[in-house]
Regions:
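Nucleotide/phosphate-binding sheet-loop regions of phosphoryl- and nucleotidyl-transfer enzymes
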Residues: 1-393, 420-422, 426-429, 436-438, ...
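C-terminal accessory/binding modules appended to enzymatic or scaffolding proteins
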Residues: 18-19, 403-445, 551-553, 835-851
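Short beta->alpha connector loops at strand-helix junctions that form conserved
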Residues: 45, 452-454, 473-476, 579, ...
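Conserved alpha/beta-domain cores
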Residues: 97-98, 521-523, 529-906
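Long, charged amphipathic helices and adjacent flexible linkers at domain junctions
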Residues: 228-233, 369-421, 426-428, 508-551, ...
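Structural motif
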Residues: 242, 412, 429-431, 450, ...
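Glycine-rich phosphate/ribose-binding loops and adjacent secondary-structure elements
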Residues: 334-336, 436-444, 450, 456-462, ...
Length: 906
């Protein structure tokens, strides 16, 4: 280790600045910055993150040269303040706090009031004129130091404290008398001796170095490790340690402590927002022991301090070009700034603040785009619960928050019931063990979806996000009875028709009916509000228009219906990246014909059934083309195995048994069901998702692809004849070999030529493939000789690369994440080293064969900001995601383009 490792700061002077977060951590860098620009900051020094790394490597010892540097800076602090650490007459007290590069609130350790001992406590009492205050500070030090530094369980201090309060019949700490505090000091010191075999150190310098070591050590405590894993923070950064002169807000009626924001973090309104308490310590604001006052009230109680705070916070916001979250203390009328950092805010506030700051001339449009987390835009699109109403309802259970928004409705357990109830005007929540593709109609009819099993990429989760439906999955406290009549949560039974509410932002399941309200953005898109009536919508569209100026990636939407397409287009989608034809088959009127086709044993019979389906498909595609107004529409030919369109084998067996056991068995009905059961058994596969599906189905049943392609081009030609523009892209799924693609392309091209000949019009189109199995990626150069575009189906590409079913993997994926086997869930964020390497290879090889090859992504990863960054880096042309994720993708694509520009890229 070489060079400077300890950095001093005081009002008007600082060794560091805000650009040194890697060295000083976020807290230390901002303290240095505030001090450097002349703000009233309690003086102190920061020990660098590099020392933390060295500390971990050197058997948890602070290097000798760093100790010397610490003592040198301590002397500087003592000279500046006129106080001395450990001095009995005028003791210097300091806080020792962590501060990593990225904010990790509450994850690491802090020690306050360091420097107190049996002698200096008397000096503090004389100096403050308040012996009780001094004793309480010492009590807090023993508690924190004993826990953080000496390893005495915190609960043991709490037990002593609670016992004392119970004995004295008091409720709050501030009610403890001087005598009671002296007794607690004695008991705390005895506890430390009993637990550690050592006395509490009376030497102040010894306390300091022990506390610094403990804070470094806390970088690797379990909660900090977990927090970094969950928030994608590298584990090897280390924390800095900030040693700072203590200031006290509980020195009397001219002292106070508080926290605040330079703008309202919930609404974005430009106002000083926060709370403070007179004659209190910072932890009292957080603990709620006393009700704090709004900062505005300080204007009356402490007008001079309020004016100074207003001036300082306005200066901070202009200096940092962002909303600031600040902490302050007033000691005997003097204001001290303890911390500033960029303020966390809601999605609504984030967009308003970004736009307002551009219009105020505070930031550029490009800077504004980097101020909003892409995922936060979700909050502007989904219905939300009325906050006050929600507080009145019991939380029954919690699951995974799979699709955001708020929904309230009556419980139903079957998709068919959801539809019938909805047709009667009822609002319903569909509750299932898990959902499958044939539940689509019921999911669509529901206000929200709740499943007992499944993960963030389960069918319910993916479809819920696509539909914009609130969805909670993996709620394992819910036990459905076998007949599907009710579900049980411990002693509470919830029956069909009972009202529940689900919160797709928190994952909570609540009892009863809670009032919801749609977002203003959605109200405008639906035509329920005019754009000029919604300030939120105006901010939303203006902000995203800036994003569109800078992004390179196109953004499309996964949409199967005209309604989906209409919503996607309103959200700014530039085409449809995935239209799943099989979802169109599940409509009630069509299911009989698809079943007829599946049950037919001869090709001629199948063609007759398909002829009945063709008009439906043609109408579907016509409506999609009309909605997209000439933008590309990528249509995937049939993908799932045929058995998914038929009833489950077990359900059929039960139904047949019930019919046979009835008093008047319907023989014709029984024979029909038995024939259906035989076909279901014949189509059954051990591993259907790797079986007879995708292009394999199209090759063995070419008449299905002929019908679908015919319907596509009949619809396209009709639009052209009407003077419209259309550009269909037909996508062949599950291709693993160039020969498979060539086979299907021939069928599609023939259908296109026949339709154009019939209608005497020309229609531009292209034929491409999904890249969703490793062999397709590896042989991309061969496939690209025939395919005009690729689209990565990353859901299946991840499954086939890992050899893991995304639904069956739920049971152990979380275990992998918790234990650090994986850093991320590969079904939510592209695994760049494995799946991503296959994608990179496919892009390079594909464009070697066809330089103008268009390449996109249509898996669930298309709406994940970090995956979008990767897609930009490897040169994709577009991403496709659910309609409600289109705004997120537009912003994420802009942000990666800006980052690339900042780093000197093109």
């Amino acid at each position: 280790m070489s060079g400077k490792q300890v950095y001093f700061f005081a009002q008007g002077q600082a060794d560091g600045n805000r650009d040194m977060k890697d060295i000083l951590g976020g807290k230390g860098a901002n303290l240095a910055e505030m001090a450097g620009i002349g703000l009233p900051v309690p003086p102190g020094f920061t020990i660098s993150t590099e020392v933390c790394t060295r500390f971990s490597q050197k058997e948890e010892k602070i290097p000798a040269e760093v100790n010397e540097e610490v003592l040198s800076n301590l002397k500087k602090l003592e000279d500046l303040t006129g106080q001395k650490l450990g001095d009995e007459q005028n003791p210097l007290l300091v806080s020792v706090r962590s501060g990593a590069r990225f904010s990790m609130p509450g994850m690491m350790d802090t020690v306050l009031n360091l420097g107190l001992n049996d002698k200096t406590v008397a000096g503090l009492a004389r100096k403050s004129g308040d012996r009780r205050f001094a004793l309480d500070c010492y009590r807090r030090l023993l508690h924190m130091f004993g826990d953080v530094v000496m390893g005495v369980p915190k609960r043991k201090f709490e037990q002593i404290l609670q016992g004392k309060k119970k004995k004295l019949n008091i409720e709050y700490d501030y009610q403890l008398s001087e005598e009671a505090l002296e007794e607690l000091l004695s008991e705390y010191k005895k506890l430390i001796k009993q637990e550690t075999g050592k006395d509490f150190p009376q030497e102040a310098e010894e306390q300091l170095f022990m506390a610094v070591g403990a804070v470094f050590k806390s970088w690797n405590n379990p909660r900090a490790i977990t927090y970094r894993r969950l928030n994608h923070i590298p584990q090897d950064l280390g924390t800095a340690v900030n040693v700072q002169m203590m200031v006290f807000g509980n020195f009397g009626e001219k002292s106070a402590t508080g926290v605040g924001f330079t703008r309202n973090p919930a609404t974005g309104v430009k106002e000083l927002y926060g709370e403070y308490l007179i004659n209190a310590q910072g932890e009292d604001v957080v603990a709620g022991v006393r009700t704090p006052s709004p900062l505005k009230a300080m204007k009356e109680e402490m007008p001079e301090v309020y004016d100074e705070l207003t001036e300082i916070t306005e200066r901070l916001e202009k200096h940092y070009h962002d909303v600031q979250d600040f902490e302050f203390t007033v000691q005997e009328g003097k204001l001290y700034m303890l911390q500033t950092r960029d303020g966390k805010r809601t999605g609504l506030a984030a967009v308003k603040i970004a736009v307002d700051m551009v219009e105020e001339g505070l930031v550029s449009q490009e800077e504004a785009l980097m101020m909003v987390e892409a995922g936060a835009l979700d909050q502007l699109l989904h219905p939300v619960f009325d906050a006050q109403e929600k507080k009145k309802h019991e939380v029954l259970a919690e699951g995974l928050a799979a699709s955001p928004g708020a929904a309230t409705g009556q419980v139903v357990f079957l998709a068919e019931d959801a539809v019938s109830w909805q047709e009667k005007g009822e609002a319903v929540i569909l509750v299932r063990e898990e959902t499958s593709p044939d539940d689509i109609h019921g999911m669509n009819a529901s206000q929200g979806i709740l499943t007992a099993t499944g993960g963030m990429t389960s069918h319910a989760a993916v479809v819920g996000r696509q539909m914009g439906k609130p969805c909670v999955v993996g709620c394992d406290r819910i036990k459905l009875n076998e007949k599907g009549e009710f579900f049980q949560i411990e002693k509470k039974r919830v029956k069909e028709g009972d009202w529940i509410s689900i919160d797709g932002i928190t994952g909570e399941v609540l009892d009863g009916q809670i009032k919801t309200k749609p977002s203003a953005v959605i109200q405008v898109i639906r035509g329920e509000l005019k754009p000029e009536q919604s300030e939120v919508y105006q901010y939303f569209t203006k902000f995203l228009a800036w994003a569109d100026k800078v992004r390179k990636l196109k953004v499309r939407a996964n949409a199967d219906t005209p309604e989906d397409a209409r919503m996607a287009f309103a959200f700014g989608a530039e085409g449809i990246g995935l239209a799943r034809t099989e979802h169109m088959f599940f409509e009630k009127k069509r299911l009989p014909f698809i079943k007829e086709m599946i049950l037919s044993e001869e090709e001629e019979e199948r063609r007759k059934a398909l002829d009945k389906l063709l008009p439906f498909q043609r109408e579907d595609f016509y409506d999609l083309f009309k909605e997209m107004k000439g933008h590309p529409v990528t249509i995937r030919t049939i993908d799932p195995p045929l058995h998914e369109f038929l009833p489950r084998k077990e359900d059929l067996m039960v139904k047949i048994a019930e019919l046979k056991a009835s008093k008047n068995p319907e023989k014709k009905r029984i024979r029909s069901l038995e024939k259906l059961l035989e076909r279901v058994k014949a189509l059954s596969e051990f591993n259907p998702m790797l079986g007879h599906r995708g292009c394999r189905l199209g090759i063995t049943y070419p008449e299905v692809i002929e019908m679908q392609a015919g319907a596509i081009f009949e619809a396209a030609c009709q639009v052209v004849k009407e003077g419209g523009r259309v550009y269909p892209e037909i996508m062949v799924p599950l291709v693993g070999a160039a020969e498979e693609f060539e086979n299907q392309k021939q069928v599609i091209v023939k259908a296109a030529e026949e339709a154009m000949e019939k209608h005497k019009v020309k229609c531009e189109y292209s034929v491409g493939t999904m890249i969703e199995i490793p062999r397709a990626a590896i042989t991309a150069d061969e496939i690209a000789k025939q395919a005009e575009f690729f689209s990565f189906g990353t859901n299946d590409l991840t499954q086939t690369t890992y050899g893991i079913s995304r639904d069956d993997g739920v049971g152990f994926i979380n275990h992998y994440l918790v234990h650090g086997i994986w850093k991320d869930n590969p079904f939510m964020t592209v695994d760049q080293d494995g799946v991503g390497e296959l994608m990179r290879w496919a892009v390079e090889k594909g464009r070697q064969s066809r330089p103008d090859l268009k390449i996109g992504i249509c898996g669930v990863h298309g709406g994940d900001p970090r995956s979008i960054f990767f897609c930009h880096q490897i040169g994709l042309d577009y991403v496709s995601c659910s309609a409600y994720q289109v705004p997120i993708a537009r912003l994420a694509a802009a942000q990666i383009a800006l980052k690339e520009r900042q780093q000197g890229g093109k």
